[in-house]
UniProtKB/Swiss-Prot annotation:
Family (UniProt): Belongs to the KAE1 / TsaD family.
Coiled coil feature spans: none
UniProt GO BP: tRNA threonylcarbamoyladenosine modification
Name this protein carries in UniProt: tRNA N6-adenosine threonylcarbamoyltransferase
GO molecular function annotations of the record: iron ion binding; N(6)-L-threonylcarbamoyladenine synthase activity
Bound cofactor: record note: Binds 1 Fe(2+) ion per subunit.
Gene transcribed to yield this protein: kae1
EC nos: 2.3.1.234
Summary of the function given for this chain in its UniProt record: Required for the formation of a threonylcarbamoyl group on adenosine at position 37 (t(6)A37) in tRNAs that read codons beginning with adenine. Is a component of the KEOPS complex that is probably involved in the transfer of the threonylcarbamoyl moiety of threonylcarbamoyl-AMP (TC-AMP) to the N6 group of A37. Kae1 likely plays a direct catalytic role in this reaction, but requires other protein(s) of the complex to fulfill this activity.
Record field: catalytic activity: L-threonylcarbamoyladenylate + adenosine(37) in tRNA = N(6)-L-threonylcarbamoyladenosine(37) in tRNA + AMP + H(+)
Subunit (UniProt): Monomer. Component of the KEOPS complex that consists of Kae1, Bud32, Cgi121 and Pcc1; the whole complex dimerizes.
Length: 325
């Protein structure tokens, strides 16, 4: 079977086409602003403007027509309301016009599910992006969130720090490069609260220290990464210990960071378990993960009528009964 998936929870519009074992196309376009941040109305306008050309590009890349597609999947949430509505409307229109079944997909679950295309079975997932930071795993037929940020996502924290020190957006790659030149660890707040995390304190203190002019920016970048990533690894390891699972998967835009990968690799090697990171174009927000998860849901017997395709801005992973795994 062939599935087409549309992703549009935030500032990236993605369209993916997959089979059960292969990505046939995975194209996207991201709205970028000079200072970073996302205005929901602008993101929605971006998605509406680019949907048709991106759909054509995906179909051309896959070498198929829309009639060859067996089902349509779309990101139902969580995310920005205006962006989600553009994507849902487009998915409904395609499904109705071409008489295809439609499936609404939880964006966070899709980030973990795409790893299963590569042989991952039942992992603890660390999902780290601009707006989301979660440790989740399948337990009792639902994806349970074992730990998450209580304030801002790790990606937003890094981007905000980068903006405050004047190196622009996106900040992730620039902070990572600066951190490689760090020589001294500077103490910053380490905020793990039970199984949850907080990044506002480390961000505020790192910016405060920078403004004093007494610290090298390279050392601050290094210390920011070491402190924040150690907290992420700690909560992930706790989830592994609690669930007894023997796989960890790293997903989301921040999965591109090599230091975070290294720290997780060390932890998993120490525990004698597997560690996997999907190709980066499948880690970031993308349509292929939506298509793949929607296809797995459909093959597992999940059915949607049009009334069930309303968007869910606060869509929790544990709202979804996982009958397809």
């Amino acid at each position: 079977m062939i599935a087409l998936g549309i992703e549009g929870t935030a500032h990236t519009l993605g369209i993916g086409i997959v089979t059960e074992k292969k990505v046939l196309a995975n194209v996207f376009d991201t709205l970028t602003t000079e200072k970073g941040g996302i205005h929901p109305k602008e993101a929605a306008e971006h998605h509406a403007r680019l949907l048709k050309p991106l759909l054509r590009k995906a179909l051309d890349e896959a070498g198929i027509t829309i009639e060859d597609v067996d089902m349509i999947a779309f990101s139902q949430g969580p995310g920005l309301g205006p962006s989600l509505r553009v994507v849902a409307t487009a998915a409904r229109a395609l499904a109705i016009k071409h008489n295809k079944p439609i499936i609404g997909v939880n964006h966070c679950i899709a980030h973990v599910e795409i790893a299963k295309m590569f042989g991952v079975k039942d992992p603890v997932g660390l999902y780290v992006s601009g707006g989301n930071t979660q440790v989740l795993a399948l337990e009792g037929g639902r994806y349970r969130v074992f730990g998450e940020t209580l304030d801002i996502g790790i990606g937003n924290a890094i981007d905000t720090f980068a903006r405050e020190i004047g190196i622009g957006f996106p900040g992730g790659p620039k902070i990572e490069k600066l951190a490689l030149e760090g020589e001294k660890y500077i103490e910053l707040p380490y905020a793990v609260k039970g199984m949850d995390l907080s990044f506002s304190g480390i961000l505020t203190e790192a910016v405060r220290k920078y403004r004093t002019g007494r610290y090298r920016v390279e050392d601050l970048a290094y210390s920011f990464q070491e402190t924040a990533f150690a907290a992420l690894v700690e909560v992930t390891e706790r989830a592994v210990a609690h669930t007894g699972k023997d796989e960890v998967v790293l997903v989301g835009g921040v999965a591109a960071n090599n230091r975070l990968r290294e720290m997780l690799r060390i932890m998993t090697e120490d525990r004698g378990i597997k560690f996997f990171v999907p190709p980066y174009d499948l880690c970031r927000d993308n349509g292929a993960m939506i298509a793949y998860t929607g296809l797995r849901m459909y093959l597992g017997g999940v059915k949607f009528n049009l009334e069930e395709t309303v968007v869910k801005q606060k869509f929790r992973t544990d709202e979804v009964e996982v009958v397809w795994s």
